[in-house]
């Protein structure tokens, strides 16, 4: 009986810690990570760049990625 109560208390403590960790804040998104739904979640040394996906001139999607500050990417032809 004591073992069952102890096991229940341990499981309750683990679940509480997991929930508290989730509420306290998520980890930042690393370099080249997709941040379309959370543009403000890039790590502090990164910025987010967003791109529009066009099909026949009509926007069909938008994607954002965390990238390095002061770095410019150009399309290679």
Swiss-Prot record:
Quick check: keyword tRNA processing in the entry? no
Give the signal peptide as a residue range, or say none if absent: 1-20
Family listed = Belongs to the neurotoxin 19 (CSTX) family. 10 (U11-Lctx) subfamily.
Alphabetized, the UniProt keywords read: Disulfide bond, Secreted, Signal, Toxin
Provide the residue ranges of the propeptide in this protein: 21-26
Question: Is Zinc there in the keyword field?
Answer: no
A GO term from the CC aspect: extracellular region
Q: How is it modified after translation?
A: Contains 4 disulfide bonds.
Q: In which tissues is it expressed?
A: Expressed by the venom gland.
- Where is the protein situated, by its record's location annotation? Secreted
**Main localization (coarse):** secreted
Provide a Gene Ontology MF annotation, just one: toxin activity
Question: Which named protein is this?
Answer: U11-lycotoxin-Ls1c
Q: Pfam families annotated for this entry?
A: Toxin_35
